[in-house]
């Protein structure tokens, strides 16, 4: 069954741990059915770093909320989702809620070129993402300047490939 994700940066704001964040609505589909519905919470600091403050997620049809977390609750900490000035070798937590969400990234390259859906992107940031909670999974993610995420490739623990298909304005 074909799968796809839809991600929308909303106009909604929320305050978490004293910081005003932006709500990003992320839905995952199998065919035409929503299988995961998530609100992700992000904020950008004065230096340009983008922080991840948590997520409120629900899997359907089970209605499981496993993986939901919020910075400042149960000792969870916000993590970096994107560094303003990344350097090869930088390592950082993207999210840290012990035994719930412990994703980490390592910067592998700042000058990749990738072609996705017939569009070539240059000076692409390449990260390697891992988690202590899923030690058998390693994913490479590619971020293009002025665009953001364009490609994800599972390099250990699966063969998934996620590509940016289109960018558009969301209706939320």
Language-model-derived ranges and their functions:
Residues 1-172:
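Conserved functional acidic sites
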């Amino acid at each position: 069954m074909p799968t796809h994700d839809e991600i929308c940066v909303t106009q909604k704001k929320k305050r978490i741990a004293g910081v005003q964040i932006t709500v990003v609505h992320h839905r995952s589909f199998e065919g035409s059915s929503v299988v995961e519905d998530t609100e992700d919470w992000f904020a950008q600091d004065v230096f340009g770093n983008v922080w991840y403050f948590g997520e409120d997620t629900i899997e359907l049809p089970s209605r499981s909320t496993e993986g939901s977390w919020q910075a400042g609750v149960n000792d969870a900490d916000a993590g970096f989702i994107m560094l303003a000035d990344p350097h090869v070798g930088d390592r950082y937590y993207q999210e840290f809620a012990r035994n719930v969400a412990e994703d980490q990234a390592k910067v592998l390259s700042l000058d990749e070129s990738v072609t996705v859906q017939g569009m070539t992107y240059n000076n692409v940031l390449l990260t390697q993402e891992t988690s202590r909670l899923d030690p058998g999974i390693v994913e490479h993610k590619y971020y293009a300047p002025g665009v953001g995420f364009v490609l994800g490739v599972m390099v250990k623990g699966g063969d998934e490939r996620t590509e940016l298909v289109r960018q558009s304005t969301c209706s939320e």
